Amino acid sequence: MIYIIGSGIAGLSAGVALRRAGKKVTLISKRIDGGSTPIAKGGVAASVGSDDSPELHAQDTIRVGDGLCDVKTVNYVTSEAKNVIETFESWGFEFEEDLRLEGGHTKRRVLHRTDETGREIFNFLLKLAREEGIPIIEDRLVEIRVKDGKVTGFVTEKRGLVEDVDKLVLATGGYSYLYEYSSTQSTNIGDGMAIAFKAGTILADMEFVQFHPTVTSLDGEVFLLTETLRGEGAQIINENGERFLFNYDKRGELAPRDILSRAIYIEMLKGHKVFIDLSKIEDFERKFPVVAKYLARHGHNYKVKIPIFPAAHFVDGGIRVNIRGESNIVNLYAIGEVSDSGLHGANRLASNSLLEGLVFGINLPRYVDSSWEGISTDDGIVHSVRISGNKTLSLKEIRRINWENVGIIRNEEKLVKAINTYSSSTQNEAIISYLTALAAEIRKESRGNHFREDYPYKDPNWEKRIYFKLVV
């Protein structure tokens, strides 16, 4: 039996692909609709346009990744994108005909379904998985059992010990809800990643947390304003109507997310209010019906300037894997946001996350019967970590500490404060927060999503990955 933990785009697409390849599959998720996929707004990046190519897509990905992309992975994902999209469409999913432009891309290459692509994909895949007869069970992963470097089973809250495990596929998502301001659901707390780390997987790139620049909260309802709004003409302004982003980057609203989030955050620290102006978008209600409905719920329309702020959105790091999704533990795969394939480097290109989930999920049947290759850590430094203690922290405390000390702008004092707070706790959320702060403290430079005001420049000596391995 192949067990998949997680019910987002990676887990569901892997389940369907494996089932259609004749494999026995069971999918377990702590909350079936609780992940990031149902709330993903933008789309799937793929070089399907006549003026585009996998090479151009790879170039954009590598440029935005700021020196830390795994080039082999980038070339694999961008070259597989078209084939995977064709497979997905052959399953019955229909994208809209127009391609959209998002920040960091040099071509229109974002496939979408209105402005709520993630929800449409999730609903489609969940229905398809059920039609394929895949058991989908709500339960929570507690522990992964490993012996002699190989998975032997796992433990869940309801089922207890499960031992009939041929392969275990983790698709449990990231941990951006561990920040006080977040665009993601409350299930996104990194527990799958922490459990895998405690079982012996190697984690990498934990310092690179991506903050989305355009999140709003009208009447307390947090809502992510999709990247494609800016591709279609939305402008970001301050209370004086100034498009201040051009003071930070010549691309203005179409600069990568790390630059925009930092710029908006700095403006807010200066005392400015920041808004998104949607009035320049043609045919707004047809192109963005979900945004229009959100605004209407709160008594607004697209001609009103909407207040925005940056919020934790995605994590580039995670369980280090190769292009097959294989970790350093035999028969333990990680796909989607829980993994670190090296695709995103120090900063993810918009709409590459849904693509990554589809590529690693749909292609998984190619590799499950092959001999295990595992990973290499030759492109970085492996740091051995011990975890101990019985300190207990509430999720509210952790979210506040991370936002204040391991957030958009970092420094030594704040990072050490966070490290000291988390170092005596074995809570899953504290372990992940500890490793994020520790990686950020170790990396004494600024690169991609990681910005330190005490080391504000990129250092070529730091063009290497930071790995963590648990020492028992």
From Swiss-Prot:
UniProt-annotated location(s): Cytoplasm
InterPro entries: FAD-dep_OxRdtase_2_FAD-bd (IPR003953), FAD/NAD-bd_sf (IPR036188), Fum_R/Succ_DH_flav-like_C_sf (IPR037099), Fum_Rdtase/Succ_DH_flav-like_C (IPR015939), NadB (IPR005288), Succ_DH/fumarate_Rdtase_cat_sf (IPR027477)
GO biological process: NAD biosynthetic process
Pfam families with a match to the protein in the record: FAD_binding_2, Succ_DH_flav_C
Superkingdom per UniProt: Archaea
Residues annotated for FAD binding in this entry: 7-10, 29, 36-37, 42-43, 191, 337, 353-354
Sites marked Important in orienting the L-aspartate substrate: 102
Cellular component terms per the entry's GO annotation: cytoplasm
Enzyme class: oxidoreductase
Annotated pathway: Cofactor biosynthesis; NAD(+) biosynthesis; iminoaspartate from L-aspartate (oxidase route): step 1/1
Cofactor(s) required, per the database record: FAD
Residue spans crossing the bilayer: none
Catalytic residues as annotated in Swiss-Prot or TrEMBL: 257 (proton donor/acceptor)
EC number: 1.4.3.16
GO molecular function: L-aspartate oxidase activity; nucleotide binding
Cofactor info, note text: Binds 1 FAD per subunit.
Catalytic reactions on record: L-aspartate + O2 = iminosuccinate + H2O2
Record's comment describing the protein's domains: Folds into three domains: the FAD-binding domain, the capping domain and the C-terminal helical domain.
Family per similarity comment: Belongs to the FAD-dependent oxidoreductase 2 family. NadB subfamily.
Oligomer status and interactors: Monomer.
Protein name: L-aspartate oxidase
Source organism (scientific name): Sulfurisphaera tokodaii (strain DSM 16993 / JCM 10545 / NBRC 100140 / 7) (Sulfolobus tokodaii)
Lineage of origin: Archaea, Thermoproteota, Thermoprotei, Sulfolobales, Sulfolobaceae
Gene that encodes the chain: nadB
